[in-house]
């Protein structure tokens, strides 16, 4: 109690043309989805993301981001507004969907590439980790994609412990280590198929 909702630090990587954003906060269900949603609302593109969750409930999210035009987002006032919006979302004063509706344009969720998109693909692996089901998602990259994915995982009752986000040309390759509300892997074939189909429908 008495702690700030978050601490945020940004570092511009001029040569690589992205900004590294480090967010420290307290873990809560759907946290990564909230972060992805606020970024999307501000038209900030997430190139990569690493989530680190400690046993005491503290979370460190490190994101590599740029603008939808592939440029560094350099205006300090934009970052101040984004931090304010994140704080309000974390504290429950603002809902992410409302923020997106207020700040975004009709082109939201449209693919960023003009190339014909490759089919979206989702793979599940219960062998690579002892504690988590690993979901690999290959999808056409677009602003708001990560928010769509993480919001859907939350709605399906999945908790993200580790995430590895990468974008190559026009396709995102996102990896999520997940478990259910009881901390168990997802092993039921019917549930796995439901998760896959729901994600594919949302990503259309």
PLM features: what roles do these ranges have?
Residues 1-204:
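Non-catalytic interaction/regulatory segments
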């Amino acid at each position: 109690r008495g702690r700030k909702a978050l601490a945020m630090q940004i570092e511009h990587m001029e040569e690589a043309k992205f900004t590294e954003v480090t967010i420290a906060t307290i873990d809560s269900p759907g946290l990564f989805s909230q972060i992805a949603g606020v970024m999307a609302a501000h038209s900030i593109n997430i190139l990569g993301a690493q989530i680190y969750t400690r046993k005491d409930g503290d979370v460190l999210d490190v994101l590599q981001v740029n603008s939808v035009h592939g440029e560094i987002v350099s205006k300090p006032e934009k970052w101040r507004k984004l931090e304010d919006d994140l704080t309000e979302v974390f504290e429950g004063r603002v809902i992410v969907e409302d923020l997106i509706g207020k700040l975004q344009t009709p082109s939201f969720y449209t693919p960023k590439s003009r190339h014909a998109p490759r089919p979206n693909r989702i793979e599940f692996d219960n062998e690579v980790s002892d504690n988590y089901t690993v979901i690999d998602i290959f999808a056409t990259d677009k602003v708001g994609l990560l928010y769509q994915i993480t919001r859907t995982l939350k709605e399906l009752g999945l908790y993200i412990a580790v995430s590895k986000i990468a974008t190559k040309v026009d396709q995102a390759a996102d990896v999520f280590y997940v478990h259910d509300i009881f901390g168990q892997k997802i092993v039921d074939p019917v549930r796995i198929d439901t998760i896959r189909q729901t994600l594919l429908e949302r990503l259309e």
